[in-house]
Amino acid sequence: MSAAPTSGPLTCRRAGPLRGAIEVPGDKSISHRSLLFGALSTGETRVAGLLDAEDVHSTRRAVEALGATVRTEGAEVVVTPPATLREPGDVIDCGNSGTSLRLLTGVLSGVPGLSVLTGDASLRRRPVRRVIDPLRVMGANLSARDGDRLPPVVVRGGALRGARHLLPVASAQVKSALLLAGLFAEGETTVVEPEKSRDHTERMLRGMGVPVKVSGLEVSVSAARPAGGRVDVPGDISSAAFFLCGAAALPGSEVTVRNLGVNETRTGLLDVLRAMGADVRLANLREVAGEPRADVTVRADRLEGTEIRGATIPRLIDELPVVMVMATQARGRTVIRDAKELRVKESDRLAAMGETLSRAGARIELFEDGCAIDGPTPLRGVEVRTRLDHRIAMSMAVAQLFCGGEPVVLDDVACVATSFPSFFRLLDQVSGQASGGGAP
């Protein structure tokens, strides 16, 4: 069996069960922030476990354009900040990374000069108004395409003033963009969320010496520069989800993911797995550099449908596509609500997964903010349009495990490199394949 291609179509033809112990690459959210916060700091930042994937490369190129130096020393990446961030000499291309674009919009709002942020075709279809509008309240001078709705974003950096922001939807990216702008603003900046989103920004800034006030759903900062320091990036639970969900639903499976980040704002998946009846165990639980981590084992069991809504949604928003796959194998109905955010990711993930799983034989009803899935349902092989969305591609590679040996054909797997270049190799490893999972 040949190695999986890095671009173009791929035929997935694997069989379970999934068994073994693996480590997934470093957390993407923490990796982005490590580079960006390092560039804002007064001293050097050393990062262990940085994710080596295209999205993070976009952030690296961006901070280098702003004057930071980023170099590799052995297993660490070292960020040396400039005395002050400089105006970039060219357009900053964020590739497929919405995190890069939104967080940089916040930072550059307070950096004197002109900056232009753009990205690939997928990123240029993702909304930016919900970042632009609250930043304008702080005095930011911003404009964007299509009536300020879509990238590219033009930033004319200048003086900012603190403000109190009430977010209509919990979003770690919007929250982080506003807090980062607050580091350049006069007065206090406060962000209030309807539910708690991932809190890596708060933890990391505090770990770098920035006074961060957290009270319930409120987070506040004032003007400050981080001091830099050391960041140890745990494994990404959003990447581990493909293996954990596959193992939970595929009879005879047991998978352990070592050194996995288990920050409580990210562990909605573990709660859902338990609610559905999976055997979930955590071992070697510890905290390193302010982030909890553990070795997480999931063993297959008979799954039952459940309801996923409300405050759980921000804690597993990126994992929902593969949760939808898992739900097709659970007895009864699984209902997902309050997940409208899925419609403005790299693709409309609700529509994409709903249409693709339906063609594969799933019984699924779509709502504006979620779906209902009835199971268990044997799936069949299907051709998949990945829509340049890494999570659609990887979720449907997992779905193929439930297709009774029939292949799933992904039209283009280049998108997987944005977050998880080693995905197919690790899936081969736990499924007992030689390599690649491609057509024989």
UniProtKB/Swiss-Prot annotation:
Gene Ontology cellular component list: cytoplasm
Catalytic activity, reaction form: 3-phosphoshikimate + phosphoenolpyruvate = 5-O-(1-carboxyvinyl)-3-phosphoshikimate + phosphate
GO MF annotations, alphabetized: 3-phosphoshikimate 1-carboxyvinyltransferase activity
Record-listed phosphoenolpyruvate binding positions: 28, 98, 126, 173, 349, 391
Chief localization: cytoplasm
Subcellular location: Cytoplasm
Pathway this chain belongs to: Metabolic intermediate biosynthesis; chorismate biosynthesis; chorismate from D-erythrose 4-phosphate and phosphoenolpyruvate: step 6/7
SUPFAM superfamilies: EPT/RTPC-like
Active site: 318 (proton acceptor)
EC number: 2.5.1.19
Function: Catalyzes the transfer of the enolpyruvyl moiety of phosphoenolpyruvate (PEP) to the 5-hydroxyl of shikimate-3-phosphate (S3P) to produce enolpyruvyl shikimate-3-phosphate and inorganic phosphate.
Family the entry assigns: Belongs to the EPSP synthase family.
Protein name stated in the entry: 3-phosphoshikimate 1-carboxyvinyltransferase
